[in-house]
Amino acid sequence: MTKQRTLSIIKPDAVEKNVIGEIYSRFEKAGLRIIAAKMKHLSKAEAEGFYAVHKDRPFFSALVEFMISGPVMIQVLEGENAIAKNRELMGATNPKEAKAGTIRADFADSIDANAVHGSDAEDTAAQEIRYFFSDTEIFG
């Protein structure tokens, strides 16, 4: 078992639905510790920078507009196999394909407004965590 850190973002649709606490409860019940957290309304530049890997994809502009449409809750999760565990909790990107009981099956509206973001690998997790948090903001 490997202790890992991963970045999680509760997106504007889920923040608007007031389900932050329910999502946090799922993280904690799965053995993930929240070791850093902040609520933020992303600027267009911040959203574009965070999702720069997708800049040439057809959905990029819509994704950026969605991510700046309201506040997001950004957190660092830590635990055994945190990346895979968080991705399992989130469910499939398309909520229609997500297993019952996953965050996206329960709280997402569409493939675009899909409630949460989670890092997909250790290198991207480290990069994404550094994008939003300094070392002094992480308590693990």
Swiss-Prot record:
Annotated active site: H117
Superkingdom, natural source: Bacteria
GO CC list: cytoplasm
Primary localization class, coarse: cytoplasm
The protein's Enzyme Commission number: 2.7.4.6
Coiled coil spans: none
A GO term for molecular function: ATP binding
NCBIfam families per UniProt: PRK00668.1
Family: Belongs to the NDK family.
The protein's name in its UniProt record: Nucleoside diphosphate kinase
Source organism: Francisella tularensis subsp. holarctica (strain LVS)
